[in-house]
UniProtKB/Swiss-Prot annotation:
This is Arginine repressor. The lineage of its organism: Bacteria, Bacillati, Bacillota, Clostridia, Eubacteriales. PANTHER family: ARGININE REPRESSOR. It comes from the Bacteria. Coiled coil: none annotated. Pfam families: Arg_repressor, Arg_repressor_C.
């Protein structure tokens, strides 16, 4: 959920000028996210969003530093293009990828630092992700399924 929410935040601030955390919170709620101002504040900090001046005051933007915007967009693109399917049992998630893609996808998962994914092991076309606690597995699978949906690029 966190990754999907943060990807949505990036989309929102790329599409319109958002001046306050409250405005961002309301926009996320309108898109189906159950968020609080504190959650949005943490996301802003993790995404390293900055406030830039505009004609009406200030609005949130991604920093020009490489890595922040690109890493989320890259992860979404790689997952859209490489992940074929996934399944889980207990605290283990199996992610099927195109041949040769598993290492790249596993590396992106590891770099995203999901607090509930404690590690990944990648073969040529299969990734094993270990989740803790096991109750988090269905939510992570749901996030991946959302990321697998092709966007309108």
């Amino acid at each position: 959920m966190k990754l999907r929410r943060q990807l949505c935040i990036i989309d929102i601030i790329n599409q319109k000028e958002v001046a306050t955390q409250e405005e961002l919170c309301e926009t996320l709620k309108n898109q189906g996210f159950d968020v609080t101002q504190a959650t949005v504040s943490r996301d802003i900090k993790e995404l390293k969003l900055i406030k830039v001046a505009d004609k009406d005051g200030y609005h949130y933007a991604l920093p020009d530093t490489p890595g922040v915007k690109g890493s989320f967009e890259r992860m979404k693109r790689v997952i859209e293009d490489s992940v074929l399917g996934l399944d889980y049992s207990e605290n283990l998630i199996i992610i099927k990828t195109l041949p040769g893609s598993a290492h790249a996808v596993a590396s992106l998962i590891d770099s995203a630092e999901w607090p509930t994914i404690i590690g990944t092991v990648a073969g040529d076309d299969t990734i094993l992700a270990v989740v803790k606690p096991k109750e988090a597995a269905p939510g992570i699978v749901e996030e991946f399924e959302q990321l697998m949906l092709k966007s309108n690029r």
